[in-house]
């Protein structure tokens, strides 16, 4: 069984990744489970940069494959804010209820056709031999007028999908994994890993 360390402390992301890779013969551990405690400064200018920064930092402490992601929300009307600062938007200690309400307020009076947005996820892998792989995928939607749903996390409750007629937080985990930016990026990474392992 191949060991993969996922560079995150976010239990929601870890759960999502374990669900998506559940059909693979891999053991997925968090940094904490692997006994790795490293402070990582995510100062990249792109999602891909930040994913690689994290993966490289963890790979320096293990012989296992390391996966790291960086993801966030881009709102076109707000010049792609919050972007790579999605987790730190309004401060890292600010709740997502407050962040989500702030974004809805900033879009007050903006018509639906100008509320376009996307979730972006870049996933980087550093293999035991030092090779690096990167994938990037998106999930397109728009910012709604209200918070709805309890199945997601982060910005999911304000991110709406026309094809489902609901927010990302109202999807079942299976629906979300099938279409999400992280799900698509992980499946693309899975394909790359299968070619090189």
Where on the chain are the PLM-derived regions?
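Anionic-ligand binding patches
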Residues: 2-5, 11-197
